[in-house]
Every structure is written in C-alpha cells, then in structure tokens.
C-alpha cells in the first residue's frame, strides 16, 4: 500500500508538473523557439539576398569595366586615326611647301638666266660694235650705232 500511495503521489506531482510546465513554461518556450526559428530564417534570407546583391554588383562592375575598356579602346583608335590624319596633313603641307619652293627657285633661276642673256647680249653688242668700228675704221654716230645694235640683237 505504501507503494501505491507513493506511486499515486508521484503521479499527482508529475501531473501538476506537466500542468505547470504546459500552462506557464511550454507556451513561452515554444514562442521563444518560434521567434528564434524566425530570426534564423530571416538571417538566412538576408544572407541569400546579400549574396544575390553582391553577385549583381559584381556583374554590374564587370559590365562597367568592360564598357570602360571598350570606350578606352575607341578613344585610342580615334587618337591613332587623328594622329595619322595629322601626319598626312603635315606630309601634304610639306609637299605643297616643297613644290612652292621649287616653283619659286625655278622662277628665280629663269630670271637669272634672262638677266645673264641680257648681259651677254649687251656684251656681244659692245664687242660687235667695237669689231665693226675697227673693221670700218671709223666711228659711227649714236643713231647709226643704235640701229646697228638693234639689227645685231634681232639677229642674235
């Protein structure tokens, strides 16, 4: 009988304990566990969102870098093209200047040749007059001398 009363006392104590735990502890513990579960789930979701955002940011950074490289390559290409154009313009300007100098030099040479011819004609005329004077052994007057010079110039 002692065993039965003790057993019944333990059962009653256990029942009170179950009721007490169920009434006062189980609800708050369950709520705490649910809140913790929710926080963990929210943390995992935030981590996943952060990972996704990081991947998007990396993708945007790669695209921006790629665009910058393309733009830089385009700028370099344009600069090289412009440099080639400048070189061609300089070559053309140098050729035009060379041609102008050549024409100027040719004109100057032509003028010098014409001056030399005129000087030579004058000398030839003087020599011819002197020769004619010696041949004729007489001096010609100025008008006759001038006519003789014109005739000699026409023949030369």
UniProtKB/Swiss-Prot annotation:
CDD domains: ATP-synt_Fo_b. It comes from Nitrosococcus oceani (strain ATCC 19707 / BCRC 17464 / JCM 30415 / NCIMB 11848 / C-107). F(1)F(0) ATP synthase produces ATP from ADP in the presence of a proton or sodium gradient. F-type ATPases consist of two structural domains, F(1) containing the extramembraneous catalytic core and F(0) containing the membrane proton channel, linked together by a central stalk and a peripheral stalk. During catalysis, ATP synthesis in the catalytic domain of F(1) is coupled via a rotary mechanism of the central stalk subunits to proton translocation. Component of the F(0) channel, it forms part of the peripheral stalk, linking F(1) to F(0). The keyword Cell inner membrane applies. It is found in: Cell inner membrane. It is a single-pass membrane protein. F-type ATPases have 2 components, F(1) - the catalytic core - and F(0) - the membrane proton channel. F(1) has five subunits: alpha(3), beta(3), gamma(1), delta(1), epsilon(1). F(0) has three main subunits: a(1), b(2) and c(10-14). The alpha and beta chains form an alternating ring which encloses part of the gamma chain. F(1) is attached to F(0) by a central stalk formed by the gamma and epsilon chains, while a peripheral stalk is formed by the delta and b chains. SUPFAM superfamilies: F1F0 ATP synthase subunit B, membrane domain. This is ATP synthase subunit b. The keyword Transmembrane applies. Disulfide bonds: none annotated. Belongs to the ATPase B chain family. One of its GO terms (molecular function) is proton-transporting ATP synthase activity, rotational mechanism. The chain crosses the membrane at residues 1-21. Keywords: ATP synthesis, Cell inner membrane, Cell membrane, CF(0), Hydrogen ion transport, Ion transport, Membrane, Transmembrane, Transmembrane helix, Transport. One of its GO terms (cellular component) is plasma membrane. PANTHER family: ATP SYNTHASE SUBUNIT B (PTHR33445:SF1), ATP SYNTHASE SUBUNIT B', CHLOROPLASTIC (PTHR33445).
């Amino acid at each position: 009988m002692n065993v039965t009363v003790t057993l019944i006392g333990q059962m009653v104590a256990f029942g009170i304990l179950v009721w007490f735990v169920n009434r006062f502890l189980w609800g708050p513990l369950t709520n705490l566990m649910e809140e913790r579960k929710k926080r963990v789930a929210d943390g995992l979701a935030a981590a996943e969102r952060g990972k996704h955002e990081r991947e998007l940011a990396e993708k945007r950074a790669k695209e921006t870098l790629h665009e910058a490289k393309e733009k830089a390559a385009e700028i370099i290409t344009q600069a090289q093209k412009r440099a080639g154009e400048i070189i061609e313009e300089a070559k053309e300007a140098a050729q035009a200047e060379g041609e102008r100098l050549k024409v100027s030099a040719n004109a100057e040479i032509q003028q010098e040749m014409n001056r030399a011819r005129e000087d030579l004609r004058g000398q030839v005329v003087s020599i011819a007059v002197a020769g004619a004077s010696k041949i004729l052994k007489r001096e010609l007057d100025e008008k006759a001398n001038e006519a003789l010079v014109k005739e000699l110039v026409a023949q030369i």
